[in-house]
Amino acid sequence: MLVGSQLIEIVIDSLRYENLKEILDEMFRDEVQKLKYFLEDVKEEDEELYNKIVDALKLFKENYEIEDIKIPKKIRVFLVKNNILFLNPQKGSLKPQSYLVWNAIKMLL
């Protein structure tokens, strides 16, 4: 049996998590849009580069982290400079800048 204050705490907790879900959904939509516009800009400038970038990003559909040499250096540097990927030179690995970016990659590609 719930006492009045316990019920209020449950309601407040549910509102807090609903707001958190809304915030996370908004952050995800924002990241998807940023990636989409980034890819659109690249495609307008250089379609060959766009195709190479899409091929590189497709490597992340199944894996969060990959070996850095799986992506050609020019593409790797371009994606790191544009804050799409993070390079860990000590491990020789690449991964998306965040889980939001990773999920945006998986959604768009």
UniProtKB/Swiss-Prot annotation:
Xref: InterPro entries: MJ1010-like_2nd (IPR049081), WH-like_DNA-bd_sf (IPR036388)
Family of this protein: Belongs to the archaeal ATPase family.
Protein name, entry field: Putative uncharacterized protein MJ0819
Annotated source species: Methanocaldococcus jannaschii (strain ATCC 43067 / DSM 2661 / JAL-1 / JCM 10045 / NBRC 100440) (Methanococcus jannaschii)
